[in-house]
C-alpha cells in the first residue's frame, strides 16, 4: 500500500520532532510498566507503529505520540499522570473500532486497555466482574464455559468499554433492553488519578453517564460488574432476495412490519446494490412460532425469497448465525471459533509489522478466531424516530443511491428494527433514543484510499446522503458510529436530552481540570458548525464582495462592502446564531455576501464572545459595542440590526439597549429570523397555553428541546432579564419597524408568534413570514428538497430588508 513508504516514515519523524517531551513521556511510561515496558510501548519510530495506531479502521490522519498497553488497572492512574506531566492528552482505547479513529488522536498518549480482559464469574453465575477492555467475543467465550452469557452485541472484536459507552445496541434489545441495562457497577479512573466506584448508590451521576454518554469521556473505565443471563434456545431467520426488483417492496414491507412485532423478535434488513436480506432472532421462540410470524409478515409474497428458519438454537448457534453458519447445528457441532478472539485481533496492513503481546485467547480447546479484516470504513448513522417514519419516496431514494455506487464500494445499508417497548431494566442511563427510535439506518462503504477518483466519489456520495436524509429524519444518531461530517450538532445528535446533565457530570469528574474540558465540548460543536457551513454555503458565496476583518475591544467585525456602482449607502449589522455558544461571522458569510450584493448595503457581521466561557450579558455587550462602533465608523445616521436564532435575540437586545440609552432613532428596524424572544421560565402566565412549540417540536428540528435547554444553561441569562426575554421589555413600542420569520416545526415557533402579537399590540409596523412544516433555519440546509423554499425565503428576506431600510 502506498502510504507505507517514505512519506509515512517522514510523517512519523515529524510526530516525534513535534513533541520534544516524547522522550520524557517514554521514560515515565517505562517506569510504570517496569521490565515489560519495551514490549508494551509503541512509538512512531517502531515498525509496529502503523499497526498499533490503526485499531480496526485504516486511517491516515491520526498520529499519537506514544501507545501504552496496560495489563493491570493500577497502571492507569500513573499513565494519566505521565501524560499530564508531558503536557499532552491521555486517550483510552478499548476495541479500537471508532470509525473516525477517535481512540488514536494526534499528539496523544493512547492507553490501550484491551489486555484488561479478566472474567470472574460469581459462584451462582448471576454476575461477573470483568476487565473493561475485554472484547465481546472473548467475553462470550469465557462466559460460555460457565454456562451463561451477557446481553451484548454482534461483532466479536468490539471492546466492552466502548460498546457500553455508546449504549450497547444488541440483537436481543427489543425484549432484554440495551446492554447498559445489564451493568451493575463499574470502576473508573478519573482525570485526577482517583479510582472510584460508579453504581446506582455510589456516584450515581457518573454511573448514568458512562452507560451511553460517550466512551472515555468522564474517566477511564477499568472494570464492569455485569448481570449475566442464561440465554434460552431461540429460533433464527434468514430471508434472501437476489433480484433488484424485490429491494423496494421487501424493504418497505420490512420497515412497516418488523418494528411492530412482539419484543422477542429482533431483526435487521441488509440492503445491497442488487439484492436484499433479512436476518432475525426470535429470543426464546420455537421454529413453529417464528414460521407463523414470518408467514403473516407479507414478506414471503414478495418475489422468490430463499427462506431459512431454524429452531432450537443454543446461544453459540445464535451468535454464529449469519457469520459462520446459516443453520442451527446440534449442540457442540457449531464452530464458534469466530468468538475466540485475542486482545489484538486484526489483520495485517500491507507488509507492516504487527504488534503482538500476550495474545492469549479465552479458550484453548478451540481454534483462535481468524484475524478480523481491516478496511477503510466509511459510514453514516441515522435513527428513524417513531413520530417521523420514512416515506416511500425517501425509501426509494435511499435504495437508488445504494444502487448507484460501483461493486468495489461494497456499499450496503444495515437497517435494524427498534421500537423498544419493554420497560428499561436497572437504573437510568444516558442513551437518549431508547424510547424514541423506530429503526436505525446504517450505511457503510469500503473506501478506496489508493484510488483518488473512486474515493472522491464515495465521499461525495456520503456527503449527498447526509444532505438529503438528515433534514428528513432529524439529527438522532448512534454514538457508536461517530461521524465527523454529521451536519447537525453532534452533542444533541448523539446524546439528545441528556447533554446538559452529561456536561454537569463532566465538570464533576474533571475536578480541577473541568473548565477547559467542558468548554471543549462546546468548542467542538462550534468547530462543527463552521465546518458544515463552509462545506455547504447556501446560498453560494459571492466572491465579488470585498471583506475586511477588524478587531475591536474584546470582539471583532467583518465588513462586507458592495461594489461602488451598486452601493445604497445604507448599513446593516448582522449577528450570527449558534445558541450563544458556537459560530462566528464565518457561518453566515454566504448570506452576508448575498445581502450585500442584492441590497447594496454595507453589512457589518459581529464576532462576539461565546458561552459558556463568556455568559450573559457578555455577548450582548459585544454586539452593542460593535453596533456603536459601526455608527461611528460609517457616515450614516441610522442602520438596520439583523440576526438569526440566538443572533435575532441579540439583535432585539441591542436595539432595545439603544432605545433605553436614548439612541432609538439610530435603529431603522430589526430583522429577526426565527428569534428566541422569551425564556421558557419567563413566559407570561396568560400566554402559556400559546407556548407549546418547545414540546410539540422537541425532536423535529436541529435546535431540539434538549439543545435549547443546553444553550440556555450555558448562556445563563436571568429568565426575566428584559434584554434577554425581550418579549417582556416595556418599550417595544419604541422600535420603528420589525420583520419576523417563523418556522412551523421549530421549537422557537411560539417565540416568534408571541413577539408578533406583542409588537402588533404595541403598534409597531411589522412584516411577518411563516413557513409551516419547515424546521429551524431550513434555508441553510444543504438539501435539494429545500432548495425552492430556501430561494423563496431569501427573496422575502431581501424585500423585508428593503422595507426596513426605508426612512
From Swiss-Prot:
Gene deletion effect: Abolishes the production of most pyranterreones, but accumulates pyranterreones 9 and 10.
Cofactor(s) for this UniProt protein: FAD
All residue ranges annotated as the FAD-binding PCMH-type domain in the record: 60-231
Induction: Expression is positively regulated by the cluster-specific transcription factor pytR.
Glycosylation sites: 45, 106, 120, 242, 295, 351, 419, 699
Gene3D superfamilies tied to this protein: 3.30.465.10, 3.40.462.20, alpha/beta hydrolase
EC number: 1.1.1.-
Tree of life domain: Eukaryota
Keyword ATP-binding among record annotations: no
InterPro entries referenced in this protein's UniProt entry, alphabetically: AB_hydrolase_3, AB_hydrolase_fold, FAD-bd_PCMH, FAD-bd_PCMH-like_sf, FAD-bd_PCMH_sub2, FAD-linked_Oxidoreductase, Oxid_FAD_bind_N
Family classification: Belongs to the oxygen-dependent FAD-linked oxidoreductase family.
Protein name: FAD-linked oxidoreductase pytB
Organism the protein comes from: Aspergillus terreus (strain NIH 2624 / FGSC A1156)
Gene: pytB
Amino acid at each position: 500500500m502506498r502510504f507505507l513508504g517514505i512519506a509515512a516514515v517522514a510523517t512519523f519523524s515529524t510526530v516525534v520532532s513535534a513533541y520534544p517531551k516524547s522522550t520524557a513521556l517514554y521514560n515515565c511510561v517505562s517506569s510504570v510498566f517496569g521490565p515489560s515496558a519495551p514490549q508494551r510501548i509503541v512509538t512512531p519510530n517502531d515498525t509496529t507503529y502503523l499497526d498499533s495506531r490503526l485499531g480496526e479502521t485504516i486511517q491516515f490522519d491520526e498520529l499519537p505520540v506514544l501507545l501504552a498497553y496496560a495489563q493491570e488497572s493500577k497502571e492507569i492512574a500513573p499513565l494519566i499522570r505521565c501524560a499530564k506531566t508531558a503536557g499532552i492528552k491521555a486517550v483510552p482505547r478499548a476495541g479500537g473500532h471508532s470509525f473516525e479513529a477517535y481512540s488514536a488522536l494526534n499528539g496523544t498518549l493512547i492507553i490501550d486497555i484491551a489486555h484488561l480482559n479478566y472474567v470472574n464469574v460469581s459462584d451462582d453465575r448471576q454476575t461477573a466482574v470483568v476487565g473493561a477492555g475485554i472484547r465481546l467475543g472473548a467475553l462470550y467465550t469465557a462466559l460460555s464455559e460457565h454456562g451463561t452469557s451477557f446481553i451484548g452485541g454482534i461483532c466479536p472484536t468490539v471492546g466492552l468499554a466502548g460498546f457500553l459507552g455508546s449504549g450497547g445496541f444488541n440483537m436481543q434489545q427489543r425484549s432484554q433492553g440495551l446492554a447498559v441495562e445489564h451493568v451493575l457497577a463499574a470502576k473508573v479512573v478519573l482525570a485526577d488519578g482517583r479510582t472510584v466506584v460508579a453504581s446506582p448508590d455510589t456516584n450515581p451521576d457518573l454511573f448514568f453517564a458512562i452507560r451511553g454518554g460517550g466512551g472515555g469521556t468522564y474517566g477511564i473505565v477499568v472494570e464492569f460488574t455485569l448481570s449475566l443471563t442464561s440465554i434460552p434456545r431461540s429460533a433464527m431467520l434468514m430471508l434472501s432476495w437476489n433480484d433488484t426488483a424485490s429491494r423496494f417492496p421487501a424493504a418497505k414491507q420490512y420497515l412497516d412490519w418488523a418494528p411492530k412485532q412482539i419484543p422477542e423478535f429482533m431483526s435487521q434488513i441488509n440492503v445491497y446494490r442488487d439484492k436484499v436480506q433479512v436476518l432475525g432472532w426470535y429470543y426464546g421462540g420455537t421454529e413453529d412460532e417464528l414460521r407463523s410470524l414470518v408467514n403473516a409478515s407479507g414478506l414471503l409474497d414478495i418475489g422468490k425469497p430463499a427462506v431459512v428458519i431454524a429452531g432450537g438454537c443454543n446461544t453459540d448457534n445464535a451468535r454464529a448465525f449469519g457469520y459462520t453458519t446459516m443453520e442451527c447445528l446440534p449442540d457442540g457441532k457449531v464452530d464458534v471459533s469466530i468468538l475466540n478472539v485475542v486482545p489484538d485481533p486484526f489483520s495485517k496492513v500491507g507488509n507492516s509489522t504487527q504488534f503482538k503481546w500476550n495474545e492469549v485467547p479465552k479458550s484453548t480447546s478451540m481454534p483462535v478466531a481468524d484475524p478480523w479484516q481491516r478496511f477503510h470504513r466509511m459510514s453514516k448513522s441515522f435513527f428513524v424516530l417513531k413520530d417521523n417514519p420514512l416515506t416511500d419516496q425517501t425509501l426509494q431514494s435511499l435504495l437508488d443511491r445504494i444502487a448507484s455506487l460501483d461493486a468495489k464500494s461494497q456499499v450496503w445499508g444495515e437497517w435494524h428494527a427498534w421500537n423498544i417497548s419493554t420497560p428499561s431494566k436497572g437504573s437510568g442511563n444516558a442513551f437518549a433514543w431508547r424510547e424514541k427510535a423506530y429503526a436505525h439506518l446504517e450505511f457503510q462503504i469500503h473506501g478506496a484510499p489508493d484510488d483518488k477518483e473512486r474515493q472522491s466519489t464515495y465521499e461525495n456520495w456520503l456527503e449527498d446522503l447526509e444532505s438529503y436524509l438528515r433534514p428528513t429524519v432529524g439529527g438522532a444518531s448512534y454514538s457508536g458510529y461517530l461521524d465527523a461530517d454529521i451536519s447537525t450538532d453532534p452533542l444533541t445528535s448523539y446524546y439528545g436530552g441528556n447533554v446538559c446533565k452529561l456536561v454537569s457530570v463532566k465538570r464533576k469528574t474533571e475536578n480541577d481540570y473541568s473548565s477547559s474540558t467542558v468548554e471543549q465540548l462546546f468548542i467542538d460543536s462550534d468547530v462543527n458548525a463552521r465546518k458544515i457551513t463552509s462545506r455547504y454555503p447556501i446560498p453560494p458565496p459571492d466572491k465579488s464582495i470585498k471583506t475586511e476583518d477588524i478587531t475591536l475591544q474584546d470582539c471583532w467585525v467583518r465588513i462586507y462592502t458592495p461594489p461602488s456602482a451598486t452601493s445604497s449607502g445604507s448599513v446593516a449589522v448582522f449577528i450570527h446564531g449558534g445558541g450563544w455558544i458556537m459560530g462566528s461571522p464565518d457561518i453566515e458569510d454566504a448570506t452576508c455576501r448575498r445581502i450585500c450584493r442584492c441590497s447594496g448595503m454595507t453589512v457589518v457581521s459581529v464576532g462576539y464572545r461565546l458561552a459558556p466561557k463568556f455568559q450573559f450579558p457578555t455577548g450582548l455587550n459585544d454586539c452593542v459595542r460593535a453596533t456603536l462602533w459601526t455608527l461611528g465608523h460609517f457616515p450614516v445616521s441610522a442602520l438596520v440590526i439583523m440576526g438569526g436564532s440566538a443572533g435575532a435575540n441579540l439583535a432585539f437586545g441591542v436595539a432595545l439597549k439603544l432605545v433605553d440609552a436614548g439612541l432609538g432613532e439610530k435603529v431603522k428596524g430589526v430583522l429577526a429570523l426565527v428569534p428566541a424572544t422569551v425564556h421558557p421560565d419567563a413566559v407570561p402566565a396568560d400566554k402559556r397555553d400559546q407556548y407549546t412549540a418547545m414540546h410539540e417540536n422537541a425532536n423535529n428540528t436541529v435546535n431540539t428541546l434538549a439543545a435549547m435547554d443546553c444553550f440556555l444553561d450555558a448562556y445563563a441569562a436571568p429568565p426575566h432579564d428584559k434584554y434577554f426575554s425581550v418579549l417582556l421589555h416595556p418599550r417595544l413600542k419604541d422600535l420603528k419597524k420589525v420583520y419576523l420569520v417563523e418556522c412551523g416545526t421549530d421549537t422557537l415557533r411560539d417565540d416568534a408568534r408571541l413577539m408578533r402579537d406583542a409588537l402588533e399590540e404595541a403598534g409597531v409596523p411589522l412584516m411577518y413570514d411563516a413557513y409551516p412544516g419547515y424546521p429551524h433555519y431550513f434555508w441553510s440546509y444543504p438539501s435539494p428538497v429545500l432548495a425552492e423554499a430556501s430561494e423563496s425565503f431569501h427573496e422575502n428576506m431581501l424585500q423585508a430588508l428593503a422595507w426596513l431600510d426605508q426612512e
